[in-house]
Design a protein with these regions (language model features):
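Short, charged/polar "capping" segments at the starts of alpha-helices
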Residues: 26-31, 97-99, 146-147
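Rossmann-like NAD(P)(H) cofactor-binding subdomain of soluble oxidoreductases
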Residues: 43, 54-57, 61-134, 150
Length: 267
């Protein structure tokens, strides 16, 4: 998808050896192979392309960007390769339905203890990054060395990375901002955009309480994983969640919206 190809583009610019993997039956991957571009950017020849998951076997870091509800199936395929001593970075925001499992928990079910898991969350749209507009994001991991290694390895481009201090809170905050984005779209669709300030204020407070109730640090909700992502989610014309809420309020059928915007789950 757009986010995964952006990450490949970004890490290549940081002089890492990058391979972009996609499924054989993926139309977007076939376009990358045929044209080395999508509607936004062209990938240089220095980025390798592969439809074989075995391409990750020699990688030190595996960055994953798929739909939250697709992670379990992908991790099942990865587990068949018996990876060892790798860092898996999850770059999507959501919870696994129907039980609300955090994505790092899902990934951990398939990996041996020799591997490490990190999350990459925070604001940003690829359309703006490609235009050179910078932003700040968070990398978090239960393993301190992994966290510092990734921030050092991924820094130096158009994203300023911060060290996360609460993996549970950062994952819950990032997933929950999707719901606030949809609510913001409702307000836009009802011509009640002036209420977005109240939505952001009350929404952040309630998500802070949720994080605390789940065992995380409530103050994480006020960081880049949630409140810091509101501009990109609540106001931006690129926000899928906001656009979904606005179109739904104006009468578009929910199933057609989900197909058009590739939204498989809202949280």
């Amino acid at each position: 998808g757009r986010w995964g190809s952006f990450i490949a583009w970004l890490l290549d610019r940081l002089h890492h050896e990058v391979t972009l993997h996609g499924r054989k039956n993926s139309a977007s991957m076939q376009r990358w192979i045929g044209e080395r571009r999508n509607d936004l950017i062209e990938l240089p020849e220095s980025v390798s392309l592969s439809t074989e998951l075995s391409c990750m076997e020699n990688a030190e870091v595996v960055v994953i960007s798929v739909g939250a509800q697709d992670l379990r199936a992908l991790m099942g395929e990865i587990a068949l390769l018996s990876p060892k001593n790798k860092i898996f970075v999850l770059c999507m925001k959501g919870l696994e339905m129907p039980h609300g499992k955090r994505l790092s928990v899902v990934a951990s079910e398939f990996l041996s203890s020799s591997n490490r898991i990190a999350v990459w969350v925070g604001p940003g749209h690829v359309q703006e990054f490609y235009r050179g507009i910078p932003n700040c994001m968070v990398i978090d991991s239960e393993d301190e060395k992994t966290k510092h290694f990734l921030v050092d390895a991924f820094s130096g481009g158009i994203i300023r990375f911060y060290y996360g201090q609460d993996m549970l809170g950062n994952e819950i905050g990032a997933a929950s901002k999707n719901v606030v984005g949809i609510a913001a779209g409702f307000l836009d669709g009802l011509s009640l955009s002036s209420l977005k300030g109240a939505l952001m204020s009350r929404g952040t407070h309630e998500i802070a309480e949720l994080i605390g109730a789940l065992g995380g640090n409530p103050f994480s909700a006020y960081g880049l994983c949630h409140l810091g992502d509101y501009e990109a989610t609540v106001f931006s014309a690129y926000s899928h969640n906001r656009r979904f809420g606005e179109a739904f309020v104006r009468g578009s059928p929910i199933m057609s919206l989900r197909r058009a915007m590739r939204l498989h789950a809202l949280l």
